[in-house]
Amino acid sequence: MRLLFLVLLVLLGLIQYPLWLGKGGWFKVWDLQRQVAEQRETNDGLRARNTALEAEVRDLATGVGAVEERARSELGMMREGEVFVHILPPGTPLPSGNSTPQASALSKPRPPATPPRR
């Protein structure tokens, strides 16, 4: 009887081995589920980024406003007659010398405006 119990115990152990430690065992399944969850999070972030980029491409392709906004923010461009004002944070030292190219344009007197004709 003891021998039969020992043989059955060994057989049970051999049957359980692939379930827990084998190629498709529970530990492998848990690890793969964790990897799938991480990949889903990555995919969600990339999907959101792609949606934002698609919207930006649509804006750039259809509207002039987006192109103008990008030219202003990234290239520092201005329309004719606009004045660029840069507000420095408190405690920032002032730049030495005249670093504004607009200063000479501001010092020129403007011609008087002519009244509209009727």
UniProtKB/Swiss-Prot annotation:
It is found in: Cell inner membrane. Its main location: membrane. Residues 22-118 are periplasmic. One of its GO terms (biological process) is FtsZ-dependent cytokinesis. The chain crosses the membrane at residues 4-21. It is a single-pass type II membrane protein. Keywords: Cell cycle, Cell division, Cell inner membrane, Cell membrane, Coiled coil, Membrane, Transmembrane, Transmembrane helix. Residues 28-62 form a coiled coil. Residues 1-3 are cytoplasmic. Residues 109-118 have a biased composition (Pro residues). One of its GO terms (cellular component) is plasma membrane. Part of a complex composed of FtsB, FtsL and FtsQ. Belongs to the FtsB family. Essential cell division protein. May link together the upstream cell division proteins, which are predominantly cytoplasmic, with the downstream cell division proteins, which are predominantly periplasmic. This is Cell division protein FtsB. The lineage of its organism: Bacteria, Pseudomonadati, Pseudomonadota, Betaproteobacteria, Burkholderiales.
